[in-house]
Every structure is written in structure tokens, then in C-alpha cells.
Amino acid sequence: MWRLLTRMPGVGFDAVQGPAQAHAAASLLARFHSALDDLEHAFVGLRSGVHDTPAHLARLAQVVDELPRHRLHAPVARLAEAIAARAAELPALHGLPARVVHGDPKLNNILFESAEPPGCERPLCLVDLDTVAPMPLPLELGDALRSWCNPRGEDERVARFDGATHDAAIAGYLAACTLALAPDERAALLHGVEWITLELSARFAADALREQYFGWDRTRFPAAGEHNLVRAEGQWSLHEQVFAARPQRALALRGVPGAAPPSSSGAAR
């Protein structure tokens, strides 16, 4: 069965071009969430286990126990220990409402008017809608921030958390969001990106030993395990940075809806 959709002209980006683009992208995501708030739909073909962080952490612990002779066991085991210790510190995200969200809000799932300003700061639509499903909002927004706020991407051992991009995205989201967020739901927005980075680090670390799921770059790495270990360490690096930046991120989340977007002069050219 094929699904026919109207073609949307536009330009996609693999990395955020600056705070103004992040503000606009987050505003579009907020409008998407708000528009679907009253949707009553029986979803079929849902991806099981998506963002089931406890399951991913348990899987990592299991694979560390099962493959003690793997060539990468020692660094993966050290990372797994750090991940488990941090998970025990983070506030649990239990009991939050499941809202209809995109499910994969990375930047290249948003189309923009053009490649250059001001068009690159004018989002047209979200694409790749097969992941749309109910999910707690903090995990959706956390996944977006994980993707947008690390200009070094997923294939480097050391990440770089871009606080300006984060703050612009939060301001754009809050300005456009019309959802009636409960106090605990809004408070949990602070911790979504912490959990998501931890979860993805655990997933990459597990596959560094299993070498079964994620693809890998044969031009840069000798095998899948080495590539996935770099990815796992990169997400741990990003997690450490967003965890350390929690006070600053909390200030951004307390921002007043309707804040002016950042100047496009901050966009990378």
C-alpha cells in the first residue's frame, strides 16, 4: 500500500543554522502539537518501546554481562556504569499525559522556504509523519533539543551543547504553544533532554557490543562497534553538558511566552 501526499517544495537542513532558525523551528513544532491537541485517533503500527528508557538501560546492562570478551567491553562497561549512576539521579518522568507528537523532530524533518536568510528562518511544514504517535511532551521536546543543540552531530566523541540555540528554541516553543500544560508536565520539560541523551548513549553503547542495529561509516571506523562507541561517548558528552547547564536551561523555561525571536544576524552563513 502506498500513501500519496501533496509535494511540499522546500529545503531541509542537517544542522541548525543559528538561533533564529531554532526559534522558528520550535515555533512550528509547538503549533503542530497544539493543532493536534484534540485529535481522537486510534493509531496503528506504533513503534513499540520508543523512548522506554528503563528498557534501554536494562538492555545495556544485559549486553555488558553477556559479552565480556568483546574487544570494546572495557570502555562500554565503564560508560554503562556512569549511565546507570546518572539515571538513578534524574527525576522520573512517570504519570505524564501522552500527547500526539511528531515522534522524530530532528531538523531535517522540517522544510524551510530556502537555503539562505530570511527563507531559512521560515519553516513550511514537518515531514516524515510515520512516527506521529502519543508520547509525553518532555520526551518529544527533549529529542528535538538533543538534535538541534549539538552542532557537532552524532558522530563525534565530544559534543558541544549550544546554549543560545537551546534558549532560542525554548522561547519559540513557549511563544507558540497553546497546550494547557499541568505544572508537573511543564516542570518535566527541563529533564526531557537529559533523559533522551542518556537513553541514546545507552542504545549506542549496547550496539557497540552487539554490532547489529545501527549502520556505520566504513571510511572512518574499522567496524560498527568502534563507530557506535564514539556515538555513545558523544551522547554522554552532550548529556554531561546539558546536565551541567540545568540552571541556565531552567531560566529559559521560565521565559515569558511571546518573547521576540533572536536576530537573524546570528544565523550561520
Q: What are these model-predicted stretches?
A:
Residues 1-5:
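A conserved loop-to-beta-strand element in the N-lobe of protein kinase catalytic cores
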Residues 8-23, 38-103, 107, 111-122, ...:
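ATP-dependent phospho-/nucleotidyl transfer catalytic cores
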Residues 33:
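Helix-to-catalytic-loop junction in kinase catalytic cores
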Residues 138-179, 195-214:
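Active-site activation/catalytic loop segments of kinase-like enzymes and analogous catalytic loops
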Residues 181-193:
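All-alpha amphipathic helical-bundle segments outside canonical DNA-binding/catalytic cores
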Residues 199-269:
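ATP/Mg2+ or Mg2+-diphosphate-binding catalytic cores
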